[in-house]
């Protein structure tokens, strides 16, 4: 049975803060559970809701003007959410409401509200690239890798896209300019900034405050549309979150990285936006072609990949002076797979100071072996490479999260061999090491190649963990 707390024995100020917030005298249990949240609760209580309503309306006018909703509906939704706690008696749900309201009152203005004020002048920094000259070369490279056999009986997961993506993209373009120290983009949109002929869907981003940003954005969409918005966390993707609507339609996703990782990611500046250096993106594309699913994507839409590949090839030609003459020297580097222990040995002595690289296909095994080495100098680049790297006694140790394709029993397919080489080169770029000669040889090794069928492939490392989510409507946070 709930009893009101004895006001003579409890701190009156804290009690009053909680009482004002709940719109009722708290029970003894509510008081003792919420008293440590008094500071956050007070910030929520004194928060100027009128200014917040005005900011959301301005965001709506600028980025969601085609959404049919009135100013009064937006205001009602906001005021309703900020009074939701008065009708909530479950302690867990109250904690969720306090946490999410706290994010809004402390961060929304700086993260999304700022997008409504006049922006700095855009510094035009585009270079004219002759992408057309690379299209035939890109097509030849991709054609030799178009070797996946599509299983028509295989049920593919559908990726439903929300109609709000175009609105969010418009917002993201401005967000990337205003927050270019903490948020950068990669993928199709970043290449579109170099080559306007590139088609893109949603905008792929890396940022240092992903969770806060996505919560603020989810509430903005909720207040404008009235839809229930859900944030999901996927266990096998590091520090990844996605916003979906109540019908499971994809709106936007984001990877979170540390600031020290952000600082070392190679990037270039275009129109006040930082994008991941296309050289780095090209290496990632080569690496990802070792993933059987990505080769299946290539088989379905080769022209989409061709436009991207040609753009990146032209960028590296222009930026690094790469000559495409077919001289590949020792590329791809020799790769020998131990299928039982799931380790690939790459001979690196022709290019780097370390003589070989041991590439683990199971991350937990690598972690265990690094502990056994008693070495504490490993580099973890989080979702940028999906791997740690360690150089110890002239040997590199790293993890490869993709499948390994085989062209025959026990023989690594050249597509995967190049992917492994690209994975090593990502480390070189991130640590400001030498990579240009190796890059030149790697790209030239992709020229004038015949198609080699896939004999089989290794399975990807299985990641443990559970899906997490934030359900705003139901006041649930599970992480």
Swiss-Prot record:
The active site is at residues 202, 204. Pfam families: Pox_polyA_pol (PF03296), Pox_polyA_pol_C (PF12629), Pox_polyA_pol_N (PF12630). GO terms for molecular function: ATP binding; metal ion binding; poly(A) RNA polymerase activity. Its EC number is 2.7.7.19. InterPro entries: PolyA_pol_cat_Poxvir (IPR004976), PolyA_pol_cat_sf (IPR037265), PolyA_pol_nucTrfase_Poxvir (IPR024231), PolyA_pol_nucTrfase_sf_Poxvir (IPR038419), Poxvirus_polyA_pol_cat_C (IPR024397), Poxvirus_polyA_pol_cat_N (IPR024398), Poxvirus_polyA_pol_cat_N_sf (IPR038337). SUPFAM superfamilies: Poly(A) polymerase catalytic subunit-like. It catalyses: RNA(n) + ATP = RNA(n)-3'-adenine ribonucleotide + diphosphate. Keywords: ATP-binding, Calcium, Early protein, Metal-binding, mRNA processing, Nucleotide-binding, Transcription, Transferase. Ca(2+) 1 binds at residues 202, 204. CDD domains: polyA_pol_Pox. Induction: Expressed in the early phase of the viral replicative cycle. The keyword Transcription regulation does not apply. Ca(2+) 2 binds at residues 202, 204, 253. One of its GO terms (biological process) is mRNA processing. Heterodimer of a large (catalytic) subunit and a small (regulatory) subunit. Polymerase that creates the 3'-poly(A) tail of mRNA's. Belongs to the poxviridae poly(A) polymerase catalytic subunit family. This is Poly(A) polymerase catalytic subunit. It comes from Vaccinia virus (strain Western Reserve) (VACV). The gene is OPG063.
